[in-house]
């Protein structure tokens, strides 16, 4: 899972830390709980049947992606206040406007959100201008949609979803964006999305019936 070409870089250190934490989680939780989803094993899900998101905003109950896969968390991360409808997220709403309603990117809520972030903070996911976000990120999403529409959904580990080099998903957060979309399994056994919302949204819009995911966390009551 480690990219040897980036040895010595911050990206490599993040990836190494994530991988080590994943295997530590697996060993400790396998001993404690007996049976959890093994590290980096893919689980097939129907994206149309998972309609909620686990919030990962900075609060005391949030899940932490940087803590690795194979987490077993007994906290209130799956409480009602931390669960949100997937279709209310700006990524889903914006991509629906783009690919179902046929709107120009500039008229979508996702583009307007990115524009607001750039104007307020000077950048958004490493894009320092609205023009670069439109020319690079939005074009990439258009191409990804067409690729999935023509050829079906292919696993990310086959390097079919390589994001632009400038994008934060290919720099600071590369270590987990190389994975499949992330899910968490709550205490009742229900799946919730954690990350990978663009790929999930496109799969939903194109009515793909099965995609691979990685499990970030399970509640012990689901094991």
Residue locations for each model-derived region?
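A basic- and aromatic-enriched beta-loop-alpha substructure that forms the phosphate/nucleotide-
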Residues: 60-130
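A short, basic-hydrophobic beta/loop patch
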Residues: 22-40, 49, 55-57, 71-93, ...
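Generic detector of well-ordered alpha-helical segments enriched in charged/polar residues
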Residues: 17, 24, 28, 51-54, ...
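Non-membrane alpha-helical secondary structure
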Residues: 4, 8, 12-15, 19, ...
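Compositionally biased, charge-rich terminal segments
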Residues: 1-21, 65, 72-82
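Surface-exposed polar/charged interaction patches
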Residues: 4, 10, 22, 26-29, ...
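Short alpha-helix boundary/capping and kink motifs at helix termini
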Residues: 106-192, 216
């Amino acid at each position: 899972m480690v990219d040897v070409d980036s040895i010595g870089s911050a990206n490599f250190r993040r990836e190494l830390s994530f991988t080590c934490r994943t295997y530590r989680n697996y060993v400790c939780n396998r001993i404690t709980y007996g049976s959890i989803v093994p590290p980096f094993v893919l689980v097939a899900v129907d994206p149309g049947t998972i309609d909620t998101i686990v919030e990962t905003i900075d609060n005391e109950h949030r899940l932490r992606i940087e803590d690795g896969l194979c987490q077993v968390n007994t906290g209130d991360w799956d409480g009602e206040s931390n669960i949100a409808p997937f279709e209310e997220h700006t990524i889903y709403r914006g991509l629906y406007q783009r690919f179902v309603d046929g709107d120009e990117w500039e008229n979508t809520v996702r583009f307007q959100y990115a524009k607001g972030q750039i104007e307020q903070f000077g950048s958004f996911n490493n894009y320092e201008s609205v023009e670069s976000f439109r020319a690079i990120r939005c074009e990439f999403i258009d191409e990804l949609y067409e690729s999935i529409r023509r050829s079906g959904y292919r696993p990310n580990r086959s390097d079919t979803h390589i994001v632009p080099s400038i994008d934060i998903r290919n720099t600071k957060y590369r270590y987990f964006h190389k994975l499949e979309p992330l899910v968490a399994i709550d205490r009742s056994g229900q799946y919730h999305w954690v990350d990978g919302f663009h790929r999930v949204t496109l799969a939903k819009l194109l009515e793909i019936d099965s995609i691979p995911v990685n499990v970030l966390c399970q509640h012990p009551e689901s094991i």
